[in-house]
Regions:
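N-terminal low-complexity, intrinsically disordered segments
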Residues: 45-76
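Core alpha/beta structural scaffold of self-assembling particle/tube/pore-forming proteins
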Residues: 2-35, 48, 71-329
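N-terminal assembly/attachment segments of tailed bacteriophage virion structural proteins
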Residues: 40-43, 100
């Protein structure tokens, strides 16, 4: 069975002092999801095929001298694909050589590219849909977008109908629940390859010597058990008021409690809430509300983190404030 580790854990196993660890550190700085999301190697060169249990076998109370009818569970196979996220960084050789440590300079110059890839990955994690963009992977929203679907019981309708709607997600990361994947035979995380000195061309066609670096990140998402993901959809940001119990306001703490109660067993993985900046800012300001008993600040891995019922609340700017209303289809 493959192991599910965060990218930081994978980097440490490869080499505690490797450049990969530095890249992962840069990734984590601008993408809080990577502090929680675990990855495992897929069983396909292009993704991962998993067997999902769709029904449990029946058990029977037996009387003496009476037999028991055989029963079996029902399963379905699901194939999740990975996407290939790539970019190139090009830097003037003269500039890179000035500080005497070319490798460190190239990595520092590449931070903008790494952050761009981070944002693209986070956006795809929440909104990727291979029926629209085949080159990406299928994210969370495409899996939880129908109130009448079987997994619609894990979509909580916050009641919003306007144009400034958002979602709050509760994801329980784990090998048997939901986790990231990378292709069979490849490496976890973002790969950096220095292509060395090349001749570059400026906007006017002029030639100059420079260094080219290739970045590649192959990743995807697989969901073993949809019961361990909850979407609080149709959250109208205009109704997030100072007093969540005021008339016309969204009682977000109550919705968060409902989400927690939908998870069958929180110990099956690492539960984390994800929301955008506006929602987490509201939650942080609620800490000093005299009525608040659920929201607090906790220290997780040396960082101060907003928590709800001791579950971390991560800020993810990839979550939109202009989502379409989630309805029954």
């Amino acid at each position: 069975m493959p192991q599910a580790l965060t990218l930081a854990d994978w980097a440490k196993r490869q080499d505690p002092n490797s450049k990969q660890a530095k890249i992962v550190e840069l990734l984590n700085q601008s993408n809080e999801i990577l502090d929680d999301m675990v990855f495992a190697e897929g069983n396909l060169p292009t993704g991962h095929r998993t067997t999902v249990r769709t029904g449990l076998p029946e058990a029977t109370w037996r009387m003496l001298n009476y037999g028991v009818q055989p029963s079996k569970s029902t399963t379905a196979q699901v194939t999740d694909s990975t996407g290939m996220l790539e970019t190139y960084s090009e830097v003037d050789k003269k500039l890179a050589d000035l500080n005497g440590n070319t490798s460190e300079f190239l990595l520092s110059e590449a931070q903008a590219f790494i952050e761009s890839m981070n944002q693209e990955m986070a956006e795809t994690l929440f909104y990727g849909d291979t029926t629209v963009d085949a080159e990406r992977f299928t994210g969370l929203s495409a899996r939880f977008n129908d109130l009448s679907a079987k997994n619609g019981v894990n979509i909580i309708d916050a009641g919003g109908t306007g144009s400034n709607l958002t979602s709050v997600w509760l994801v329980t990361w784990g090998l048997n629940t939901i986790h990231g994947i990378y292709p069979k035979g490849s490496k976890a995380g973002l790969e950096q390859q220095h292509l060395g000195e090349v001749t570059l061309t400026d906007d006017k066609g002029g030639k100059y010597q420079g260094y080219r670096t290739h970045f590649k990140w192959e990743n995807g998402l697989t969901m073993r058990d949809w019961r361990y993901v909850v979407r609080i959809a149709n959250v109208d940001l205009s109704k997030l008021t100072k007093d969540p119990e005021a008339t016309g306001a969204i009682d977000l703490p109550d919705l968060l409690i409902q989400a927690i109660e939908k998870i069958p067993n929180l110990s099956m993985g690492k539960p984390v809430f994800y929301c955008n900046q506006q929602v987490r800012s509201w939650m942080r300001r609620q800490i000093k509300n005299s009525k608040n008993v659920n929201i607090s600040m906790q220290e997780v891995a040396g960082k101060k983190v907003v928590s709800f019922d001791e579950i971390p609340v991560r800020r993810t700017d990839a979550i939109l404030t202009t989502e379409d209303q989630v309805v029954a289809k």
